[in-house]
A protein has these predicted regions:
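Residues forming the Rossmann-fold NAD(P)(H) cofactor-binding site
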Residues: 20-21, 73, 112
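Terminal hydrophobic/aromatic helix or amphipathic segment near a protein terminus
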Residues: 205-245
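Amphipathic terminal alpha-helices
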Residues: 2-3, 245-271
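A short helix->loop->beta-strand "cap" motif at the edges of active sites that frequently abuts
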Residues: 86-90, 123
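N-terminal Rossmann NAD(P)H-binding glycine-rich loop of SDR-like oxidoreductase domains
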Residues: 2-29
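NAD(P)H-binding glycine-rich loop region in Rossmannoid oxidoreductase-like domains
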Residues: 39-78, 82-85, 96-101
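SDR active-site strand-loop-helix element
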Residues: 13, 56-57, 91-97, 128-130
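Oxidoreductase cofactor-interface core, primarily capturing Rossmann-like NAD(P)-dependent enzymes
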Residues: 103-207
Length: 271
């Protein structure tokens, strides 16, 4: 028997980001009212009659005066506080695959603390611990854009041998929809990643249709660049230097949320 999806309003924090923008487009195909929210919006009012809340606020690359705590933890605390007075039946949160409460990296630590806050809100929560997310060729997103060649070259942080399982943006969007609106989907915390594990160098080659040259950056130099280059931070460099490889069956998780995972080579084949 087919379970009827929730048809009430869906509130989306951080709705202007890579995934939030795509999610809003997808939600507009459904009968649900979409409520995109920014930092200054009244969350309690927006959540007041919402069926579901999707918390996207957060960033690996905050711009001053924003901070890692303000962007990744304080926004989650505000969402959790507003949820406590809301009739919402689900809250969905995108965390990061290697988030840990004891992490020395403040981005990873605040992501883990944000998870705790949302689990404690009283609203059934679905938390996806995502690997690096990439978009299609016409909207690659910040991570993929860093691996697209300029003048035939790609500069890699570290040796390029670090491992990742990049996750397609539209697969994330579909999983969020099912988690938020389908009452039959489970709650809990789930690792979510793409179907193929590869090195950072292989990722770069798959994103570029023409032959490219890659050049690695020694780890110590990469960490120094994270402190002096305005577009980098120590936390971002640390994340990009590390492996992000799932230890759970992500294909099974995808199926539980109505998703058949896309392969990077197929998504970017037509570029």
């Amino acid at each position: 028997m087919r379970v009827t999806w929730r048809t009430g309003p869906v509130a989306v924090t951080g709705a202007s980001g890579q995934v939030g923008t795509a999610l809003r487009r997808r939600l507009h195909q459904l009968p649900n009212q979409v409520r995109p929210l920014g930092r200054k919006d009244d969350l309690a009012a927006a959540f007041g009659d919402a069926d579901a809340v999707v918390h996207h606020a957060g960033t690996l690359q905050p711009r001053k005066p924003n901070t890692y705590r303000a962007a990744n933890l304080d926004t989650a605390l505000a969402t959790a506080a507003a949820l406590a007075r809301s009739p919402a039946q689900r809250v969905v949160f995108l965390s990061f695959l290697t988030a840990r409460l004891d992490a020395s990296n403040s981005y990873l630590r605040y992501k883990a603390e944000a998870e705790e806050a949302l689990r404690s809100s009283g609203v059934p929560a679905v938390i996806f611990r995502c690997d690096h997310i990439y978009g299609p060729p016409d909207e690659p997103g910040p991570t993929a854009s860093a691996f697209v060649a300029k003048s035939g070259r790609v500069m890699l942080l570290g040796s390029g041998t670090q491992r990742l399982a990049p996750l397609y943006r539209e697969d994330v969007v579909e999983a969020i929809l099912h988690a938020a609106l389908d009452p039959a989907t489970p709650t809990g915390t789930f690792q979510f990643a793409g179907p193929d594990t590869m090195s950072a160098e292989e990722f770069a080659h798959l994103l570029n249709s023409k032959p490219i040259r890659t050049r690695g950056t020694p780890v110590m130099l990469a960490r120094l660049l994270g402190r002096v280059v305005p577009t980098l931070t120590p936390e971002l460099v640390d994340v990009m230097l590390g492996d992000t490889v799932p230890t759970e069956d992500v294909a099974a998780t995808a199926r539980r949320f109505g998703v058949e995972l896309h392969r990077l080579a197929d998504v970017w084949r037509s570029q």
